[in-house]
């Protein structure tokens, strides 16, 4: 339910396209994947059409699509109800990546309100973009480019705050919410709290947040362990495991978005 195939990013493209990614899925007995449509224009139907034209002739399994909303205008809002007729019933918004993906809270509210009124599900990438930008700037100013600083500049508490903020916005919008790639113990606590207040909030995590920790970002080959959000501490892994076991977290996805390590498709 959460993959990124043939995704342009940081001057390169993810290494799995719609053929190789879905072929690998089939080998692993996965018969359906759900990819994301980038909002490359203000015509959402055109964004969906362009991706389908590229993917339809190459996929080896069934696939579905989520729609990223990364730029807001009233005209975009008017198009959201029509997404269902195009086979897209879920939208993703971001509270991070300030320079290219993040929506302001007021715009996230607008998206959620329309989605809730028309039976669409809003997915949320929950991190604190302002804190990340500041910490990255400070780290770079003193020369910290080691992989471990990917985790140190994306604070866990920022993710916890963003989950609670997203839940609060969803409550005000009277809309269901799906939190993607949860990786912090406090996020699970916030999910439980939101549910205790009657909110419809779904939690998702990924295998990397169950089996690996930020100590892997200090290995010789640490670049191989970079993912976003980053790997966390063992106590976070343990809480995520408990959340899966007791049903607080309902979805185990992959967030599959690989890049070649050997420089075949270098990241700028």
Regions found by a protein language model. Name each.
Residues 30-32, 61, 89, 250:
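Short acidic/polar active-site loop segments enriched in Thr and Asp
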Residues 1-8, 58-60, 212-225:
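N-terminal small/glycine-rich loop or linker at the start of catalytic domains
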Residues 75-252:
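Histidine/acidic residue-rich metal-binding segments in metalloenzymes
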Residues 44-66, 109-124:
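Alpha-helix-loop-beta-strand connector modules within alpha/beta enzyme cores
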Residues 67-74:
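Active-site beta->alpha loop and helix N-cap motifs at the rims of alpha/beta catalytic domains
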Residues 4, 37-39, 68, 95-96, ...:
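Short, ordered loop/turn segments at secondary-structure junctions
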Residues 33-35, 64-67, 176-181:
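Short catalytic-loop micro-motif centered on adjacent basic/acidic residues
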């Amino acid at each position: 339910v959460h993959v990124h195939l043939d995704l342009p990013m940081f001057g390169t493209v993810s290494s799995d396209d719609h053929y190789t990614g879905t072929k690998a899925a089939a080998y692993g007995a996965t018969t359906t994947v759900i990819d994301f449509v980038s909002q490359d224009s203000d015509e959402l139907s055109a964004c969906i059409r362009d991706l389908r034209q590229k993917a339809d002739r190459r996929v080896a399994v069934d696939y579905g699509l989520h729609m990223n909303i990364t730029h807001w205008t009233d005209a975009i809002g008017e198009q959201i109800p029509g997404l269902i007729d195009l086979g897209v019933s879920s939208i993703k918004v971001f509270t991070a990546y300030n320079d290219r993906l993040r929506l302001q809270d007021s715009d996230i509210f607008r998206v959620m309100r329309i989605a809730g009124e028309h039976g669409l599900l809003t997915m949320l990438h929950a991190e604190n973009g302002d804190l990340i930008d500041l910490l990255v700037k400070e780290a770079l100013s003193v020369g910290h480019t080691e992989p471990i600083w990917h985790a140190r500049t994306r604070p866990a508490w920022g993710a916890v705050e963003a989950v609670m903020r997203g839940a609060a916005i969803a409550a005000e919008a009277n809309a269901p919410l799906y939190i993607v790639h949860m990786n912090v113990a406090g996020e699970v606590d916030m999910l439980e709290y939101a549910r205790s207040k009657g909110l419809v909030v779904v939690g998702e995590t990924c295998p990397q947040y169950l089996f690996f920790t930020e100590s892997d970002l200090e290995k010789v080959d640490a670049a191989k362990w970079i993912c976003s959000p980053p790997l966390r501490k063992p106590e976070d892994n343990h809480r995520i495991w408990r959340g899966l076991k007791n049903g607080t977290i309902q979805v185990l996805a992959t967030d599959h978005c690989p890049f070649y390590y050997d420089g075949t498709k270098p990241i700028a």
